[in-house]
Amino acid sequence: MKIIILHGLYMHGLAMQPLSHKLRSFGYQTKVITYNTLAIEKNRVFEKIDQALSPDTTNVLVGHSLGGLIIKAYLDKRKPSQQMVSHVITIGTPIKGASIVHRIQELGIDAILGNSPEHGLKMHHDKWEFTQKLGCIAGTLPVGARALLMMDRSILSDGTVTVEETMIEGMTDHIQTPSSHTSLIYNSFVPKQIDHFIQLGCFDCS
């Protein structure tokens, strides 16, 4: 089984190598895809995913933050079979858009986001209707810019994305962990949960 991994905003594929390494230790093939998150060329990213998918085994798509939204757009465009792509796991992904992005736009500093809001980060209503099983992982350690920009410390978040924003109607399972938005991809909890979700179709809540 092969896992294709996409990073989030302001990141490079190198940031996902520790997660990739941990997943390889579980016996998976992995491929990390790098793309320009501020000047997203959707078709080029989709072509990279096409090339990364193995025709000889089942594939899994894993995305951190914006990467999960790129995966959702990929499924909508390419509509791969469940035999080709069986599972999707999002890590800290605002699957229906991010309120912090709306706030940044209100403040008139949205140039820092490049064209990323046009690729899923704007708030939108949606539900998961793809054949692939979707597992969503959320952080609950509010370390990040959200507290300064949003002034909503009472809302459970990872410091960037709220827990509620990581949920979508139709998802298969959802789990929380005390991590910040960035540290989600560096702990040992996430790769173990990815493996559990792939193998059993649910997260390990024990």
What kind of feature is each model-predicted range?
Residues 4-9, 14, 18, 22-24, ...:
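Serine-dependent carboxylesterase/thioesterase catalytic core
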Residues 130-206:
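C-terminal catalytic-base region of ester-bond hydrolases, centering on the histidine
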